[in-house]
Amino acid sequence: MMMSDLPHDLVEEILSRLPLISLKAMRSTCKTWNVLSKHRSFANKHIGNVTASGKRDLIMIKDCKVYSIGVNLHGIQNNNNIIDLSIKNKGILHLENLDLIFKEIFNVFHCNGLLLLYGSITDDSIRLVVCNPYWGKREWVKRINNFASFDKLAFGYDKSCGCHKILRVFDSYPNRLEIYNLRSNSRMVSSFPLKWDIAFMQDGVSLKGNTYWYAKDRRSEDCYLICFDFTRERFGPRLPLPQPFIDEFLGSLYVVREEKLAVLVKRWRGGKSEIDIWVTNKIEPDEVSWSKFLKVDNTPRFFLTEGYLIYDEEKVVVFFNKEETEGLKSTVHIAYIVGENGYFRRADLREPLYQPLCRLVCSYVPSSVK
């Protein structure tokens, strides 16, 4: 029996179980399947199956293309006790010739199935593009321009109207905010008295439609979290970190399964580093509680850590780093896999990381938003 002879409902059920990366091939294989895949009902069913599987895709930007990647935590151990940790490209997600538009992509933000890409285009100006990898569509953000080097961007979701918004915090005017509504294509500039600064070179992360940053009091230099609530269009109160920290010991914020926020803390004692990872029990714009996820003692110094991934079910964290080879002739890219009860492995990535991982890789959950 040919696939075309099967009942429509059965075909839909089979196709709705395909992985995200197979959408492009499915649409190009058969006109009927292409039409089916563009129905909202099919998209909702397909996305529901992807979400129910519990698997989370990682999106990586390489050479101005968007890839779906997978990480093999176990790898193959060689004679030198070094694991070959494979970072496998599952394939390119079709997104209307991004590589022909951008010269370089500086950052990527993910919120509710959409990606916000920030980079330089062919005339060297800085532009923003919003993409939905599920539909393979992109749209220019036309009314946000004239970026300064240290302006802060955030990507969020207004639950009251069901639309995505972009926030810009101006570096030159620290009390000035700009909010762009993607649905109405409207732009609003307002003043908001800020008594704190967003941590230098730290990007915010989107969780449940809101964005969280490290912030530091301008007088006391105390460090804490701050949240921008995109529904109420305002910053929330200061949220305490698990314990008092100095910001240079804090690693990047990380979102776990689109449900929790993780904080990494590094300390150095006697030539060795101690790493604590805390995960939220509860996280809202005006409330947070923490529990310790993992403590790692006596690990090498992670001076140049480029990013990390948390696998909460396996109780494992993967740290990405650079190491200079003997004689400082070249730099190799490696990863440390650490877990409970002293579990520690060094993994050889063999090929260079394409960009700093913490900036150009994010967890991705698809959305049917067009």
UniProtKB/Swiss-Prot annotation:
Coiled-coil regions, chain positions: none
Domain (F-box): residue spans on this chain: 1-45
InterPro entries linked to this entry: F-box-assoc_dom_typ1, F-box-assoc_interact_dom, F-box-like_dom_sf, F-box_dom, SCF_F-box_component
Signal sequence residues: none
SMART domains according to UniProt: FBOX (SM00256)
PROSITE patterns in the cross-refs: FBOX
SUPFAM superfamilies: F-box domain (SSF81383)
Protein name: F-box protein At3g20690
Origin species: Arabidopsis thaliana
